[in-house]
Amino acid sequence: MSGPLSPVCSCPQLPFMLSPCHMHHHPGHVALSQTVSPASLLTQGLGLPQH
């Protein structure tokens, strides 16, 4: 899942996971955005299994 885009999109640090940009690139994170930590977001952004 590598690409020209950064692992965590190009949105601001927080609340980047609530922005339309992040929802577009990482729709799976929207449901987790209220429970995950920044460190977890980075791991998920890299495409590593977190669940």
Swiss-Prot record:
Tissue pattern of expression reads:
Highly expressed in pancreas, heart and liver followed by brain, placenta, lung, skeletal muscle and kidney. Mostly expressed in females.
Q: What is this protein called?
A: Putative inactivation escape 1 protein
